[in-house]
Structure formats: C-alpha cells, structure tokens
Amino acid sequence: MAARAGPRAALAGAAAVALLSAALVLYELPPGAVLQRAFSLHKAHSVEDMENTLQLVRNIIPPLTTKKHKGQDGRIGVVGGCQEYTGAPYFAAISAHKVGADLSHVFCTREAAPVIKSYSPELIVHPVLDSPSAVHDVEEWLPRLHALVVGPGLGRDNILLENVKGILEASKARDIPVIIDADGLWLIAQHPALIQSYQKAVLTPNHVEFNRLSEAVLSHQVDGSDHHEAVRRLSQALGNVTVVQKGERDVISDGKQVLECTQEGSSRRCGGQGDLLSGTLGVLVHWALHAAPEKTNGSSPLLLAALGACSLTRQCSLQAFQKHGRSTTTTDMIAEIGPAFSKLFET
C-alpha cells in the first residue's frame, strides 16, 4: 500500500499547484447545500475543493482509445470569415482541432476561403456564407456537427448577418450547441430573441461586447463595480443562457451560479485570444454534454466547459508569454495548447 500512495500523493500535489492558479468562486448562492450539490465542495476555497472542481473538468474529457472512429471526439463548425477577417475563423477552428476535435469545419465567404485553406490543410473550408443558399448549405452539414462557433471573423455585412440568423435558427431546431463570439455577439445585441432561453448557447463577450449586450437586453449598462452580479443578471435576462465575460478574471454564469476563473494568464492582449477560447469552448461543450451524469456530479456541463476553456486559454497565454514576452501572438499561444492541456488536465 505504501508503494501505491507515493504516485497518488505526487499527482494530488501537482494538481494542487495548478489549482492554486485556477480557483473557482461561487457567488449569490445559499451556502453549504448548493455548494455541495453543484461541485461537491465541503469547505470553501480549500485545496481539496479546488481539486474537486478541476477534477470535474477532467472528468468530461474523453479518453483516447483505439476503439473510437474518426469524428466521435468532436466535429466542430466555425461560422465566420470574410474578405477583411480570415485569421479569426482559422484561430477558432485550429484551436478546436488541437484541443481534441477530430474534424474542424469553417463556413466562410467565397473570398475568404482560399486564404483560410492556405493557413492549414487540416481544416475543411466551405465557401458558402455569402451565397443566396447559405442557410441551406450550412444546414445540410448540421447533422454531422456536434457544436457551432458563430462569429469569429464574421464582420457586419447585412447579407452575412441575415444568413447567420437563419443558421442560428436551424441550429436551435436541431438542438446543436452554439458558442457566440465577436460580431456574432453584435448580431445578438440587435436581435436578442435569436438565443433567448436557448440552454445550449454560450456567449463570450469582452468588456465592450458585454456592455453592448447589457444595454440591449437590460436597457442600461449594469453596475460595473460588481462583475459577478452583472453577469448573473444578463444571463437571467437572456433566459439563463450561459455568459462568459472575459476580463482580468473571467466571470461565468448561467443565471443561477456564478464562477470566477483566476487561472494565471499574461499581460499580453493581442488579437485572436478570444478565438482560441471560442474554438476550445466548442469542443469542451460537446464533451461536457455527452459525459455521463456521474462525471459532472450534477453540476452544469456548460459551466464546467466554460471554466475549462477559460483556464486552458489563460495557461496557453502564460506559457507563450514566458517564451516570447511582448512579442507574443495568438499563433504562439495556439502552439502551447498541447502542453497547456497536458499540464492542466492530464498530470
């Protein structure tokens, strides 16, 4: 027995170190019972509590096995990419692929397709988003997709936005999870009913996008001094849609629970990090929703997926910054996905 205890103790110690920088905080909840029901926590902010929390994220990650066939671990679609913006959909799709999705699709405009194809032969690129038949063309692929990431590199062209509205409606009709970022959030601010009360939607606004959504949905900007209450209120107003407010500390809420991810990141704020997050989140949402109930221990699959995606994105940023400093780019961060994933979830 003594020989077996050593490796387990070392594993717990390594996990505790990672968890000290990836703390989870819950707000606006009755103490005790809800904490235990949601995350099996027994003593707030202890190392054991944090280990339990990250273990729930680890639990949703499917094991690698030779018994699976291509596609089972995730087929993710990214809707976005236009003449001006080709990097964002690539960042989202390749991040999903590197996290563990078997296939990544990009549905973009005809002009953007050759550019995105040139970035990587590993992505499946569909030049349909500006077509008159765009909704039908994407809808044909929906039965083969596990999650849709909407918004990276989308732009605000009226034709594209109208097509995306139809794609969102078709995705909801098929009960497909949707992660909405960037100009997808601008569209939601104009038409909140598109995702109202859709429980498989996750919004990932930054500070500016969050304020825009709050003004559209709540008719005013919420009190910025209480980020946790602000995110909770926006989620509730949207019908308990999961909201991830990106910031110095990422705040996540489904209107019932509020989580705070304090995983250490870096001070570098280059464009594209949100695309890494949204692509990662697409995969983790798929895994979380398909995990056995005992794996999540009764907690919200989407909250766990969001916490995992935020933690991984921050860890990638930290590792890239340690190597490249001020010159760090999102490409550098994407190169860290494998090592960061292993450090957080497989050690």
From Swiss-Prot:
Intrachain disulfide bonds: none
Pfam families associated with the record: Carb_kinase (PF01256)
Keyword check for Metal-binding: no
Highest rank taxon of the organism: Eukaryota
PROSITE patterns per UniProt: YJEF_C_3 (PS51383)
Nuclease as UniProt keyword: no
One Gene Ontology term, aspect cellular component: mitochondrion
Residue numbers of Phosphotyrosine PTMs: 85
SUPFAM superfamilies associated with the record: Ribokinase-like
All copies of domain YjeF C-terminal, residue ranges: 53-344
Modification type N6-acetyllysine: residues: 67
Binding site for (6S)-NADPHX: 153, 206-212, 275
GO terms of biological process kind: metabolite repair; nicotinamide nucleotide metabolic process
Catalysed reactions, semicolon-separated: (6S)-NADHX + ATP = ADP + phosphate + NADH + H(+); (6S)-NADPHX + ATP = ADP + phosphate + NADPH + H(+)
EC number: 4.2.1.93
Cofactor(s) named in the record: Mg(2+)
Gene3D superfamilies registered for this protein in UniProt: 3.40.1190.20
MF term (GO), any: ATP binding
Cellular localization per UniProt: Mitochondrion
Amino acids binding ATP: 246-250, 265-274
Protein task: Catalyzes the dehydration of the S-form of NAD(P)HX at the expense of ATP, which is converted to ADP. Together with NAD(P)HX epimerase, which catalyzes the epimerization of the S- and R-forms, the enzyme allows the repair of both epimers of NAD(P)HX, a damaged form of NAD(P)H that is a result of enzymatic or heat-dependent hydration.
Family listed: Belongs to the NnrD/CARKD family.
Protein name per Swiss-Prot or TrEMBL: ATP-dependent (S)-NAD(P)H-hydrate dehydratase
